[in-house]
Amino acid sequence: MAKPDLTTYGGDLRDLGYAGQLTHEVHMADMDSKINESATAIDFGIAVARGTTSDNTCKVIAADADLPIGLTVRLPNRPADASGNVNYAQRDSVPILKNGWMFAVPFENVGRGAQVLSITAQGGKLGSTTGGAAGAGRVAVPGAYWETTTTAGQVGKVRIVY
């Protein structure tokens, strides 16, 4: 999780936003909630797939056949685990953005207007058609597009209309 850099004076001391943070008020977003069925914790601002155990579950994307159902939302009141990590552990309720805007950190450089892709080998981290076409290892997130041109590892904006 990104932390504000307070080593300089003046200017913008905080990041644009944090991965998975909504850019607008909650009432302007359409979200669903599903239970993380996998032992792998789910991060904020990544694509997740429909679970296999029931209609009310989701999981980390591990294969191209795991079709994305939305992007994980960061809740500001999430407690850290014993290791200091803040994410959605197994059996946690995971808020999933279906319609709205959020901040996200791309795994690769992305261009404004490019389709959001889930990078399979990175467990659902986000890329775009700027880095390569959808195909093996690069699954399109339905209705999701980058609103900003963003360098890999920096904060950008995503719009999703599911």
Task: Report each predicted region and the residues it spans.
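Surface-exposed, low-hydrophobicity beta-strand/loop segments enriched in small/polar/acidic residues
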Residues: 1-162
